[in-house]
């Protein structure tokens, strides 16, 4: 009997190892959206099944329950992203090319007002519900503009040590933001509007996307050198690092599944399993599409959304242009829906 149990145990271990080697995720849908231009951040509102997609000079609003485009917010030049203030029925859109924030009514999708920011190229944007303030992170001026979300007025500017990337909030008075060119994370006090700490993410380099686990007090910072850095946000200590795909610009955390997803522009999505606060393992690298570098997760359906498009062949290398970039094929903008098989 012991021999049979031993053989059975070995068989189960083999099956488990075989299963873990298989891809558990796949592309379920591809949503084509008309229009041309680049893209950046994407935001999911689970309560309405609406996906807010930055796209060129407009913001697309897509219903993932009906698979239909439900609205477009125009005149958002160089749009980077949107942050939702559900308690105020407002959305705040960062417009990089005209240094402004467009404030919209979330029910009607109509513009309420456009506010000029105090920096250059507002990129990532965050509504912080604890303070009811909005923070734009201005990439070319290394600062953050602070807006009172109730009055729609600029109330302050925060100087940062370098180029800010994506921010997250602990919902208790602290904002964490990647500082790309300093290889660090800065901690902002939302009451004093001061930087309290700056923590290195070494060996991570050029951090971009950032996600948060508020239960275990962890930050997930994804970096250009194909690395995810896990940081204790109570102490700033680097807990561990994991290998991810290349060209990353976004990361999402699903607290129910305890999984972290990095969207890699090379055309993969790295899936990381959290075993406990300090232990993580890479489950797989799911094929997506070249250029799918930002991501949002629906924490109810556990599906992931990644914008992408097809590319033309890159032009030949010349002395004047030693690093030519491939252009996007017109009319190919798509949002990938990725889910469990």
Q: Can you name each region flagged by the protein language model?
A:
Residues 1-8:
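Bacterial N-terminal signal peptides that target proteins for export
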Residues 12, 18-341:
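Predominantly soluble domains enriched in secretory-pathway, periplasmic, or organellar proteins
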């Amino acid at each position: 009997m012991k021999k049979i149990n031993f053989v059975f145990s070995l068989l189960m271990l083999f099956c488990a190892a075989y299963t873990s080697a298989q891809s558990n995720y796949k592309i379920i849908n591809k949503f084509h959206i008309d229009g041309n231009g680049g893209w950046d951040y994407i935001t999911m509102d689970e309560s309405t099944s609406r996906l807010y997609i930055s796209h060129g000079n407009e913001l697309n609003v897509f219903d993932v329950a009906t698979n239909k485009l439900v609205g477009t917010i125009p005149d958002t030049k160089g749009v980077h992203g949107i942050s939702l203030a559900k308690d105020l029925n407002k959305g705040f859109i960062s417009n990089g090319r005209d240094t402004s924030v467009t404030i919209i009514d979330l029910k009607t999708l109509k513009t309420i007002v456009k506010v000029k920011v105090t920096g250059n190229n507002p990129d990532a944007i965050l509504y912080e519900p604890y303070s009811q303030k909005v923070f734009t992170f201005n990439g070319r001026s290394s600062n953050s503009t602070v807006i009172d979300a109730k009055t729609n007025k600029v109330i302050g500017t925060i100087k940062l040590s370098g180029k800010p990337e994506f921010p997250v909030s602990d919902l208790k008075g602290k904002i964490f933001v990647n500082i790309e060119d300093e290889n660090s994370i800065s901690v902002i006090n939302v009451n004093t509007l001061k930087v309290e700490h700056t923590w290195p993410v070494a060996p991570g380099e050029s951090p971009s996307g950032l996600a948060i686990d508020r239960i275990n007090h962890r930050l997930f910072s994804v970096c250009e050198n194909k690395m995810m850095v896990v940081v204790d946000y109570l102490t700033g200590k680097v807990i561990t690092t994991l290998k991810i795909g290349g060209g990353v610009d976004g990361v999402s955390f699903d607290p129910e599944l305890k999984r972290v997803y990095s969207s890699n522009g090379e055309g993969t999505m790295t899936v990381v399993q959290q075993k406990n606060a300090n232990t993580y393992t890479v489950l797989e690298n799911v094929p997506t599409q070249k250029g799918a570098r930002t991501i949002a997760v629906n924490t109810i359906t556990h599906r992931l959304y990644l914008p992408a498009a097809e590319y033309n062949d890159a032009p030949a290398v010349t002395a004047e242009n030693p690093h030519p970039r491939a252009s996007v094929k017109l009319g190919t903008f798509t949002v990938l829906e990725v889910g469990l098989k």
